[in-house]
A protein has these predicted regions:
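Positively charged n-region of N-terminal signal peptides that target proteins for export
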Residues: 1-4
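Bacterial signal peptide processing site
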Residues: 16-18
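Mature extracytoplasmic domains of secretory-pathway proteins
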Residues: 32-79
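N-terminal domain-onset segments
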Residues: 23-42, 100-106, 110
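C-terminal motif of bacterial Sec signal peptides marking the signal peptidase cleavage site
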Residues: 12-14
Length: 111
């Protein structure tokens, strides 16, 4: 039983690392910047989704009234689906949380 738990833990962490390695270089660079900054509360994370058949990367806001960001695979900012004073973002990308699928946490600050 102990070995099964160990194998499960190792495989979970290696899957996250493998997903991160397939992320575009610009997203990996953003993660490098996050790692060089003090740990946030809540911890910073990057979540990959498929949105309208394309890979996108959602970065949640770190604090109240700030926008969350969604980037495409070239780090073009697509919009802010949530956050801001209303919590509703800027309305872009349109229907993000309804249409986005296959979420994968590719990085979370676990310091």
């Amino acid at each position: 039983m102990r070995y099964s738990l160990l194998i499960l833990c190792v495989s979970m962490f290696s899957c996250t690392k493998n997903i991160l390695q397939t992320a575009p270089l610009c997203i990996q660079q953003k993660i490098g910047t996050f790692k060089s900054e003090p740990k946030g509360n809540p911890p910073q994370s990057v979540i990959q989704y498929i949105y309208h058949d394309k890979k996108v990367f959602y970065i949640p806001a770190q604090c109240c009234d700030q926008y969350s960001n969604v980037f495409d695979d070239k780090c073009n900012l697509l919009g802010h689906p949530d956050g801001g004073f209303t919590g509703q973002g800027d309305g872009m990308p349109v229907n993000f949380f309804e249409d986005a699928r296959d979420s994968k946490i590719i990085w979370k600050d676990n310091r």
